[in-house]
């Protein structure tokens, strides 16, 4: 079973340098992730996305994030996200569990 606390640690170590999760959080190098689930790629208001992100046209959810977080540049060629990905499925599951809680009310 996915562990949101473990996911929070992964977020702090690997994601927080470029992303925030709280409502009203500022964009950093990457967009604020509040409201991520159910949102189309490239749609966080006020963030400058690449055309690749805007044109991908998928809706973020558990399955799309599982694929994306394994290898972001393979899933969205042309993304400016420099993160290489999380190869361990359990780490992706934990991170997604944390994001589900942290990015919604």
Curated annotation (Swiss-Prot):
Q: Which Pfam families match?
A: Cytochrom_C
What keywords are annotated for this sequence in UniProt? Apoptosis, Electron transport, Heme, Iron, Metal-binding, Mitochondrion, Phosphoprotein, Respiratory chain, Transport
Is Ion transport set as a keyword in this record?
A: no
Q: Which GO terms describe its cellular component?
A: mitochondrial intermembrane space
Entry's Gene3D superfamilies?
Cytochrome c-like domain
Name the domain of life: Eukaryota
Q: Any idea which positions bind heme c?
A: 15, 18-19, 81
Residue ranges annotated as coiled coil are none
Q: PTM per UniProt?
A: Binds 1 heme c group covalently per subunit.
| Localization (cell) | Mitochondrion intermembrane space
User: What GO MF annotations does this protein's record show?
Assistant: electron transfer activity; heme binding; metal ion binding
Which biological processes are named by the entry's GO terms?
Answer: apoptotic process; hydrogen peroxide metabolic process; mitochondrial electron transport, cytochrome c to oxygen; mitochondrial electron transport, ubiquinol to cytochrome c; positive regulation of intrinsic apoptotic signaling pathway
Similarity field: Belongs to the cytochrome c family.
What PANTHER family does the database record attribute to this sequence? Answer: CYTOCHROME C (PTHR11961)
Please explain the role this protein plays, according to its UniProt record. Answer: Electron carrier protein. The oxidized form of the cytochrome c heme group can accept an electron from the heme group of the cytochrome c1 subunit of cytochrome reductase. Cytochrome c then transfers this electron to the cytochrome oxidase complex, the final protein carrier in the mitochondrial electron-transport chain.
Give the protein name, as stated in the record.
Cytochrome c 2
Q: Which organism is it from?
A: Bos taurus
For this protein's source organism, the top of the classification is: Eukaryota, Metazoa, Chordata, Craniata, Vertebrata
């Amino acid at each position: 079973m996915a562990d949101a606390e473990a996911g929070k640690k992964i977020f702090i170590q690997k994601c927080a340098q470029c992303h925030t999760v709280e409502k009203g959080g500022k964009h950093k190098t990457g967009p604020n992730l509040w409201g991520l689930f159910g949102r189309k790629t490239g749609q966080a208001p006020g963030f400058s996305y690449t055309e690749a992100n805007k044109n991908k046209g998928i809706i973020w959810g558990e399955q799309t994030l599982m694929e994306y977080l394994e290898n972001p540049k393979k899933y969205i060629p042309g993304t400016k996200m420099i993160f290489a990905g999380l190869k361990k499925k359990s780490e992706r599951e934990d991170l997604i569990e944390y994001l589900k809680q942290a990015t919604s009310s």
